Amino acid sequence: MSMKQIETLVFDYGGVIVNIDDASVVKAMESLGVTAFKRLIHVRKIKRLMHQYINGLVAESETLKEMLSLCRKGTTTEDIEKVLEELCGNLPVERLEALVKLRKQYKVYLLSNINDTLWQKSVCLMKQLGYSTDELFDEVFLSYAMRKEKPSVEIYEEMTKQTGLNPATTL
C-alpha cells in the first residue's frame, strides 16, 4: 500500500510520540525500595494493578495504596506520584510539529493505553510546548476512558465505530 492510499494515521503515545526511559522508571522505583527481587515476586500483582489502573477500573487512590505496600516504610503517595511522572517521559517538540504537518494531509488519531493522571500531565506538557491536543489530533482514544486496552480487538473496533475510519486506508 502506498502512502497515496492512506487517509488516516493512528499513533500510540508512549514510546512513539513521547520517549519513555524504562531504566529511569526502574531506578525511580528502586529509590522507593521496590527492588528487582520485589518486582519479580510481585510481578503478577503489579501487572494486575497497572492493567486495572491504566484501564480506569480502579481509582488512583486505590492504586497508590497498593503500590505503597510494595515500597519501603516511610514512602508517601507523593513519592509514588513523582515516580509515576517518570512515565510521562520526554516529549520532543519536533514530534508535535510533525503531527501538525501530518494533519494537513491525513486524519490523525491517538490511541493509547494510559491512565487519567499521566494523560493530564502529558496534556500540560504539550501546552508548555505550545500545543493543544486539538491541534495535534482529530480525536484522542485513551484506554482509561474507554475501559478497554490495546491490543484487544474491542478497542480498535470502538475507535473504528466512533470515527468511521476505513481500516484498509489506515496506518
Write out the residue ranges for each language-model feature:
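Glycine-rich phosphate-binding loop signature in dinucleotide/nucleotide-binding domains
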Residues: 2-5, 104-105, 163-167
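N-terminal helical cap/lid subdomain that shapes the substrate entry/recognition surface
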Residues: 4-93, 104, 115-121
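Conserved Lys-Pro-Asp/Glu-containing loop-to-beta segment of HAD-superfamily phosphomonoesterases
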Residues: 8, 149-171
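Short amphipathic alpha-helical segments and helix-helix/interface helices
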Residues: 26, 96-100, 156
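Short acidic capping loops at alpha-helix termini that bridge into adjacent secondary structure
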Residues: 38, 134-139, 167-170
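Short helix-capping segments at alpha-helix termini
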Residues: 73-75, 130-135, 164
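Substrate-recognition/cap helix-loop segment adjacent to the acidic, metal-dependent catalytic center
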Residues: 94-141
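Short, acidic/glycine-rich phosphate-metal binding loop used to engage nucleotide
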Residues: 145-147
